[in-house]
Amino acid sequence: MTKKIVALAGDGIGPEIMEASLEVLEALAEKTGFDYEIDRRPFGGAGIDAAGHPLPDETLKACREADAILLAAIGSPQYDSATVRPEQGLLALRKELNLYANIRPVKIFESLKHLSPLKSERIAGVDFVVVRELTGGIYFGDHILEERKARDINDYSYEEVERIIRKAFEIARNRRKIVTSIDKQNVLATSKLWREVAETVAQDFPDVTLEHQLVDSAAMLMITNPAKFDVIVTENLFGDILSDESSVLSGTLGVMPSASHSENGPSLYEPIHGSAPDIAGQGIANPISMILSVAMMLRDSFGRFEDAERIEHAVEVSLAAGILTRDLGGRASTKEMTEAIIARL
């Protein structure tokens, strides 16, 4: 059956890295017989330009009907002070598709270890996943600003906590089988609920070890001993901070993909970096995060594990061969990086 993939190129370097990733997907499909079609839609600043809204109705309709969604990058300086901004499109898309689970893998490529701000021995063996709850918590609670006083409500239901923790256990089952649940149980009521739910869900996964960690000590361990982690699961606010902290371990945002999953609808795959408008159109953008996001899509949405591994291996050996874009310390163009990966599929 033909798989429908919606491509949201977005803004800045988005169109360049999207096309690079689709070239890799096309080359892979020729070798493996993967049957798919691409539906390109405007989104972000491109959506505002085309339809006056960062998430046009037709784009949302296409996303609802898709088997998976690829997003490259959004954001443009021309909208920084505007009422309608590209970033509002992503928030709306997450809400409309109920993308509750953000998955961010953190892996250090051997050939890029020198880019990390940490000593090489400290990042040896780092390979973990951050699972962040994306649609609940303090970001979605009431925000009250009064004269000389303010409060933000952190609100979670049992069901919201259960589904994200269950997702983490399912991921851990196919890895090293360790879940580290991160909370602030010694202070926060929501964290007390979080820990209670984690203990309950763990009973359904006797083959997976559950560990608890307070968020402050987890932030420290991510720097002092990051290799200890396998699958981290945490609430929205903590996950926002810790996933950004984890992204600096590699020393570059240019090789880090991510996914956002719903319960029953399509998943969204995107790089963690921004739209880099300062280098847009120059042909020097690093496409690896977008290409690895395609690999995540093949594995998570379509169960094509070998195809995903072929892409990931091609990326790894290309980097090991010294083919590096400028952000990685090399001179390869977007086109040269893409061609190198395709040649090694």
Regions from the language model: what does each represent?
Residues 6-23, 27-29, 147-216, 228:
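Glycine-rich phosphate/diphosphate-binding loop of Rossmann-like nucleotide-binding domains
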Residues 11-14, 67, 131, 168, ...:
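Buried hydrophobic positions in well-ordered alpha/beta secondary-structure cores of metabolic enzymes
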Residues 21, 25, 198, 290-301, ...:
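Buried hydrophobic packing segments
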Residues 33-39, 175-183, 205-213, 303-310, ...:
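Flexible, glycine/charged-enriched surface loops at secondary-structure junctions
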Residues 33-57, 222:
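N-terminal beta-loop-helix "entrance" segment that forms/cooperates
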Residues 45-48, 114, 222-323:
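Glycine-rich phosphate/nucleotide-binding loop
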Residues 49-154, 237:
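N-terminal glycine-rich phosphate/adenylate-binding segment common to multiple enzyme folds
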Residues 111, 213-220:
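Short acidic loop-to-helix transition motifs that present clustered carboxylates
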